[in-house]
Amino acid sequence: MPGRRRRVFPVVAAAFAIPVVLVVTGVGDGRVASANSSGQTQIAAAPITMRILLPGVGLERGLQVKTILAERAISARFPEITEIGGVRPDGMKWHPEGLAIDVVIPDYSTPAGKELGDRVMAFAFQNADRFGLVNVIWQQTYHPIGGKAHRMADLGSDDANHYTHVHIATNGGGYPNGTETYAD
């Protein structure tokens, strides 16, 4: 699976950059109105706090925006993940069209590896709307949004059966144009 291994420098840089908080002053639901001593109404925007998500451990080239968001959020949430595959040739549309990532699970065959994969899958479902989640495949089981999970046919290897990685497919949201901000 193509992906990028986590390097020491980006991890150290991220340790300083990820905690940075962007404060956005909005005009929507965050507005607060109050009357001053002269009876005039003053409107102040309440700050909305978002954490900017830096590029994660996966290669983003060719991924669509919601898939990038999922990749970055998973990279930020799970520092033990060191490889995420993205665009690659495949007979189905998901990877070639930038609609899916493969989150490689270290020591996938151990209880700790299974537990990590389960947490990654749960995180994807907790953020289903945000990520435009379509389905997750983990440990030979297909989990569609709004449908019943079912066991897949044996495809012959741990990799093909999705034991080595959690496959996360999104509806994409279109290709990035360079003006996107990815945030929690």
Where in the sequence are the language-model features?
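N-terminal Lys/Arg-rich, disordered targeting/topogenic segments
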Residues: 1-3
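Solvent-exposed, acidic/flexible segments
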Residues: 56-67, 93-96, 110-118
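Sec/Tat-exported extracytoplasmic proteins
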Residues: 74-82, 107, 127-131
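Hydrophobic/anchoring residues in structured secondary elements
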Residues: 83-86, 138
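Short, surface-exposed glycine/acidic/tryptophan-bearing loops
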Residues: 86-104
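Catalytic cores and adjacent binding grooves of peptidoglycan-active enzymes
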Residues: 108-184
